[in-house]
From Swiss-Prot:
The lineage of its organism: Eukaryota, Sar, Stramenopiles, Oomycota, Peronosporales. It comes from Phytophthora sojae (Soybean stem and root rot agent). Interacts with host endoglucanases EGaseA. Induction: Expressed during pathogen infection. This is Glucanase inhibitor protein 1. It is found in: Secreted. Glycans are attached at N107, N180, N213.
Length: 257
């Protein structure tokens, strides 16, 4: 990692590190806008109660499995992930989508909490979701290319510092950075972002980074999960995402049991 000791890195990844002494408000999780109601329904909000606030993101990858980061299986100051809100547009409540009980969580066997290598976890749901899962990437990493456009979804803070969670699902366009990333990253990670005011932020950890591969959501490919980085939206500072293709063999071994 570039300069952070493990504890500071963890706090940044979870969005709990102290903010810097600046007061410029920045449009974040989005720099874009609100996802249309009924779109990107494979996006999952992790909650401690069925109708409580989402504290982490994830993606539905099979009718009974959610992929998120291993950091999200810890408490994050909110308690364990007991519920997965699938297909919902909102931060909390029961207006739409479905709320499914999480019955088990399994972290990647190579997950390292000190540097966030292989930051993957698979959650198993009590019953199948009615929503369609997102497509997983090719194992050879060919779904990622230098400077390609990607999109992040989440309910995280929409301004920095002193931001507040988004009540409605947000998305932001981010450029993938495959070389000259701000940080030293391993083969299980990929960087994205670097444009001022466009970034993941507190509350977005675990959220899906996708490649839009066609005209509809059914063509979307899950390439990453929001993992860690500096406080949000800094110019020329890309954030780090768990590279899904790097964990694919393990992911498939879990969901096919």
């Amino acid at each position: 990692m570039k300069v952070f000791p493990a504890l500071t890195s963890a706090l940044v990844a979870l969005g709990t590190a102290g903010v810097e002494a600046e007061h410029v408000q920045r449009s974040l999780v989005m720099g874009g806008g609100t996802v249309p109601v009924g779109a990107k329904t494979y996006t999952v909000g992790l909650r401690t109660t069925a109708e409580g606030d989402t504290f982490c993101g994830g993606a539905l990858i099979s009718p009974t499995h959610v992929l998120t980061t291993a950091t999200c299986t810890a408490s994050l100051g909110s308690g364990p992930a007991e519920w997965a809100a699938v297909g919902t547009h909102y931060l909390n409540g029961a207006k739409d989508g479905e709320r499914l009980k999480v019955v088990s969580a399994q972290n990647h066997t190579l997950y390292n909490p000190n540097n966030f290598a292989y930051n993957f976890a698979v959650l198993t749901l009590e019953k199948p979701s009615k929503f369609s899962p997102v497509k997983l990437p090719a194992a050879d990493g060919s779904d990622i290319a230098p400077s390609m456009s990607s999109k992040l979804m989440g309910w995280g803070d929409t301004s920095y510092p002193n931001g507040a969670r988004a009540n409605e699902l947000q998305s932001v366009e981010l450029r993938v950075v495959t070389s000259n990333c701000t940080y030293t990253v391993g083969p299980s990670e990929v960087c994205a972002g670097g444009e001022e005011g466009k970034d993941k932020c507190a509350g977005d950890t675990g959220g899906p980074l996708i490649k839009e591969n066609g005209s509809g959501d059914a063509d979307d490919i899950l390439i990453g999960l929001a993992s860690w980085g500096m406080p949000c939206g800094h110019k020329d500072v890309a954030s780090v995402y768990a590279r899904v293709s790097a964990g694919l063999e393990w992911i498939n071994s879990v969901i096919k049991k």
